[in-house]
């Protein structure tokens, strides 16, 4: 599975945030779509497999697990190292609350 840092995610990318709903509500990368890890297997059909799939969480652990899940099913995924914490720290566009 490919991994990029937060600064390498292109504008307008399909960015899937796998944190739980309450975490996503607190702070999120602008444009991210929330599909919590706990719901991921039942919602994987929501992904646009014709576009690159960037997966993000808080720091990079859960997103790596989801990325591995996708790769095992023949779906390419890109893990965003540093996660939402790194995204915010880098000053990238995000929403709080």
Question: Over which residues does each language-model region extend?
Answer:
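Rhodanese-like catalytic fold shared by cysteine-dependent sulfurtransferases
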Residues: 1-14, 18-52, 61-97
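Short, surface-exposed ligand- or partner-binding patches at beta-edge/loop junctions that are enriched
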Residues: 56
